[in-house]
Each structure stands twice: as C-alpha cells, then as structure tokens.
C-alpha cells in the first residue's frame, strides 16, 4: 500500500507544480481568453488534487 501512497503523493506534487506554473502564466498574459482557460485548468487541477489527497 505504501507504494500507492507514494505514487499519489508524487502525482499531487506534480499537479501542485502545474497549478503554480499556470498561475505564473496568468500573471504574464493580458489575453482574457487565455486567462479564462488557465483559471479553468487550475480549478480542475485543484479538484484532482483534492480527490487524490483522499488516498494519501
């Protein structure tokens, strides 16, 4: 079971890094449609993180 927990933890860390990158990208762009897409991606990624945390 520890192996799965480790994998979940690694995936959570990866997703958290993706969120940070997308947040930085939002700060660098002025294009509203790009911002909207990134914000939706961030929301969905955070939902995935919350689901994965249930297994850690």
Which residue ranges define each predicted feature?
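A short hydrophobic/aromatic micro-motif that marks alpha-helical segments and, especially, helix-coil
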Residues: 31, 45-46
């Amino acid at each position: 079971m520890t192996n799965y927990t480790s994998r979940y933890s690694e995936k959570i860390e990866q997703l958290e890094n993706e969120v940070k990158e997308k947040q930085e990208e939002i700060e660098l762009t002025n294009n509203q449609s790009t911002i909207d897409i990134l914000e939706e991606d961030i929301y969905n990624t955070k939902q995935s993180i919350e689901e994965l945390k249930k297994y850690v």
